[in-house]
Amino acid sequence: MLSAGLGLLMLVAVVEFLIGLIGNGVLVVWSFREWIRKFSWSSYNLIILGLAGCRFVLQWLIILDLSLFPLFQSSRWLRYLSIFWVLVSQASLWFATFLSVFYCKKITTFDHPAYLWLKQRAYNLSLWCLLGYFIINLLLTVQIGLMFYHPPQGNSSIRYPFESWQYLYAFRLNSGSYLPLMVFLVSSGMLIVSLYTHHKKMKVHSAGRRDVRAKAHITALKSLGCFLLLHLVYIMASPFSIASKTYPPDLTSVFIWETLMAAYPSLHSLILIMGIPRVKQTCQKILWKTVCARRCWGP
């Protein structure tokens, strides 16, 4: 018999899953639609497609983990699921980092030679970073993942894989997150500095005029700030999620921590949609038509 608290957590998990499924699905469809309309990929569309695709997969991985771990806690398939989870999670972080770099490149205006050099080569550097990420993380996950569910303490720990020794391996598996997170913070910091500098200039020269560039700064910073907050919640909840699966597993704790983790791929998709005017208008039209149809066909 499920408790009321556990039932509520399951309901929240289902709602988050549906929000993430619809939100990231809308972003993927919009990216492909833009490609069909223009017959070319823009860097922004590629970033949104990669980010939404990773979030879409990550949402399914969280649901699979919630569904399978009570039944197959010592299964080898969960080891593969964990390795794939780390790869998808870090790929999502890389695409979010590329988005922050894209905003920084398009909005900020600095005259420093190093900034101008990086701005001209941002696209090529991003591709090399992504390729290097896949190679390094593939080697790292193959090396560590083979031992991830085979601790050296004997047969008893093999039966219950989520023991304290695995925090070291989980830490090493997530070590690929440090570089993109640093780049993300640097580019976000540059946006803040650029906004402050631009605000000072506008205050002196253009008082009372509509400030489009400042609005672009603020919109980008809102999106990046929400992503950073949700990602930090996701990172901090991960070790507690692992700890809650130690024998005997606490199902309520598992749902609490993984529901917090699921907020990262689901809620940020809504924030991205709100920041893209055409997608936002399309979603509003679909929602309005759905409400009207429900009223027409309702009792």
Swiss-Prot record:
Keywords: G-protein coupled receptor, Glycoprotein, Membrane, Receptor, Sensory transduction, Taste, Transducer, Transmembrane, Transmembrane helix. GO terms for molecular function: bitter taste receptor activity; G protein-coupled receptor activity. InterPro entries: TAS2R. CDD domains: 7tm_TAS2R. Its main location: membrane. Pfam families: TAS2R (PF05296). It is a multi-pass membrane protein. The chain crosses the membrane at residues 2-22, 46-66, 83-103, 128-148, 176-196, 224-244, 254-274. Residues 23-45, 104-127, 197-223, 275-299 are cytoplasmic. Glycans are attached at residue 155. Belongs to the G-protein coupled receptor T2R family. Most taste cells may be activated by a limited number of bitter compounds; individual taste cells can discriminate among bitter stimuli. This is Taste receptor type 2 member 5. The lineage of its organism: Eukaryota, Metazoa, Chordata, Craniata, Vertebrata. The gene is TAS2R5.
